[in-house]
From Swiss-Prot:
It holds the Pfam family Transgly. This is Biosynthetic peptidoglycan transglycosylase. It comes from the Bacteria. It is an enzyme of class 2 (transferase). It comes from Xanthomonas axonopodis pv. citri (strain 306). The gene is mtgA. The chain crosses the membrane at residues 20-42. It catalyses: [GlcNAc-(1->4)-Mur2Ac(oyl-L-Ala-gamma-D-Glu-L-Lys-D-Ala-D-Ala)](n)-di-trans,octa-cis-undecaprenyl diphosphate + beta-D-GlcNAc-(1->4)-Mur2Ac(oyl-L-Ala-gamma-D-Glu-L-Lys-D-Ala-D-Ala)-di-trans,octa-cis-undecaprenyl diphosphate = [GlcNAc-(1->4)-Mur2Ac(oyl-L-Ala-gamma-D-Glu-L-Lys-D-Ala-D-Ala)](n+1)-di-trans,octa-cis-undecaprenyl diphosphate + di-trans,octa-cis-undecaprenyl diphosphate + H(+).
Length: 246
């Protein structure tokens, strides 16, 4: 009897180990299923807040600013001036209509540029930025980069290009705490996003790399130069019709 009791005690740890092993094996599958469901839902449902917006709240509260609030208001793609999407694409990701989430040529150029030293250049596509802004957190860890790649693949697989761009135009930060085209148009020019001029659209696109540093409403020399370049690039691409290309 003593031997049987001892055998039972010895058998318990292996059973627990197998149970934990099963959970560890199931966890990636559960995450994959949950993330696919997330992406499918957001194909048709407009998110009330993105992970980056939530991060701004946490950042402000961590600094003791409990009165902090964001400016945001969703606008459907067809309710945004046609000059803004093409300005953003001209500024951020000119291969957007053609690539499947990753611009390998831009990545190679950025790597070569960064290897030579100087100012670090990124190569994130609009799809990658949507994956980061909607689903993930700030940071440069390999885990976050891996998740960004995973979500990029999913949104390219399950969302049409127009939905990806619509999401970007509604969650991108265009000023300190100002998220989305509608909030930017109202805060900066007291108008609706549908009424943005090509010049205003180019200025909004120009501040995207550092929206808390640059001001689209009162642009400095850098933003003015970049906005002019963006307008020229948008014209060379063919204007808004470029985004209708198959």
């Amino acid at each position: 009897m003593g031997t049987d009791a001892w055998d039972g005690k010895q058998a318990a740890p292996p059973r627990r180990a197998r149970r934990w092993l099963r959970w560890l094996m199931a966890a990636p599958l559960l995450f994959a299923a949950a993330s696919v469901l997330q992406v499918l839902i957001l194909r048709v449902v407009d998110p009330p807040i993105s992970s980056m917006m939530a991060g701004r709240y946490l950042e402000a509260w961590g600094e003791g600013d409990w009165s902090f609030s964001l400016h945001r208001q969703w606008r459907d793609y067809d309710k945004i001036a046609a000059s803004l999407p093409i300005s953003v694409v001209a500024a951020e990701d000119q291969q957007f209509p053609m690539h499947h989430g990753f611009d390998l040529q831009a990545i190679e150029k950025a790597r070569d540029h960064n290897a030579r030293g100087g100012r670090v250049r990124g190569a994130s596509t609009i799809s990658q930025q949507v994956a980061k802004n909607v689903f993930l957190w700030q940071g440069r860890s390999w885990v976050r980069k891996g998740l960004e790649a995973w979500y990029t693949v999913l949104i390219e697989l399950f969302w049409p290009k127009q939905r990806i761009l619509e999401m970007y135009l509604n969650v991108a930060e265009f000023g300190d705490g100002v998220y989305g085209a509608q909030a930017a148009a109202q805060q900066f020019w007291s108008k609706d996003a549908a009424g943005l001029s090509p010049s205003e659209s180019a200025r909004l696109a120009a501040v995207l790399p550092s929206p808390r540093r640059y001001d689209a409403r009162r642009p400095g020399a850098f933003v003015q130069r970049r906005a002019g370049w963006i307008q020229r690039q948008a014209r060379q691409l063919g204007g808004p019709a470029y985004l209708q290309a198959p």
